[in-house]
Amino acid sequence: MTTVDLSGQVALVTGASRGIGRAIAQELAKQGAKVIGTATSESGANAISEYLGNGGKGVVLDVNDAARSVELIDEIQKEFGAVSILVNNAGITQDQLAMRMKDEEWDSVIATNLTAVGRLSRAVLRGMMKAKTGRIINITSVVGSSGNAGQMNYAAAKAGVAGMSRALAREIGSRNITVNCIAPGFIDTDMTKTLSEQQIAALLQQVPLGRLGAAEDVAAAVSFLASPQASYITGTTLHVNGGMYMN
C-alpha cells in the first residue's frame, strides 16, 4: 500500500480540539503536513497545540467571525506558507421539530455549518490558485443525504455544503484544486458516549456493518482525499457510514 506523504503541505482544520476534528488533525500531522487546528476557546487551542507538538499549533477562531477568518488565512501564510489543505469540520447542531424551530435555531446552524464553510473556502482560494494546487475537504453528514426528523436546519446546511462543493469543484478544477465532501454516519465520539446501550443498539440496526465508526475512519478518508493519490477525484462525497446510507 502506498504511504501518504503530505510533507510540505499546510493544513487548516476547523473544530480540531476533540472528536473527528482532532483525529483529522493528528492524521494529517502524522503524514507530514504542518497543521493549524482551530477551537472556539483558548483552552481548546492550547489542547490542540499540545497534542500536535512540532506538527503544528492550535488557534482560536469563531468561524462566524468573517474578518477574523480572513485574517487567520493571512497569518498562516506569513508563518507557514499558503494553506494547501482546508478541512471544514467545525459545526453545530440545534435540533428541534420543524413546527417548534425558531428562526434563531435555523439561522445559527446555517451560519456555522454552511455560510462559514463557503467563507473559508473562498478565503484560501487565492493562495491555492497561485500555487496551482489545493485540496478543500468539507465534512458533511449522512443526514444531509438521508434526512432526519428534528434536524431540518442541520440537514439543509449539510446538503447545501455538498451542492456548494460540487459547484466550486467545477469552477476551480482547471487550477488543479479539488473539492470533496466526507459524510460520516454514526461515529463513536463524546456525543455517542452519553447514549444508553439500548439507544446504541437501535442506532446500529440501521448500520449493515453493525458497529459505530471511529473518528480515525473519517480521518483516514480525509488523509486519502488530501493525498496525491486522490488527485483525480473532485466534486464527490465519500460516505463513511458502515452502509447506513448507500447511493
Model feature map: region roles:
Residues G173, T178, I233-G235, N241:
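Short, small/polar-rich loop/turn modules that mediate ligand/substrate recognition or access, typified
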Residues R126, R170-S174, S231:
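Alpha-helical segment proximal to the catalytic Tyr-Lys
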Residues S121, A157, S165:
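Active-site helix of classical SDR
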Residues L97-A98, K102-I110, T192, L203:
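Substrate-binding pocket helix/loop in short-chain dehydrogenase/reductase
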Residues S141:
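Residue(s) in the substrate-gating loop at a strand-loop-helix junction
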Residues V10, S17-R18:
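Conserved glycine-rich cofactor-binding loop
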Residues Q31-A47:
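Conserved glycine-rich Rossmann-like NAD(P)H-binding loop of the short-chain dehydrogenase/reductase
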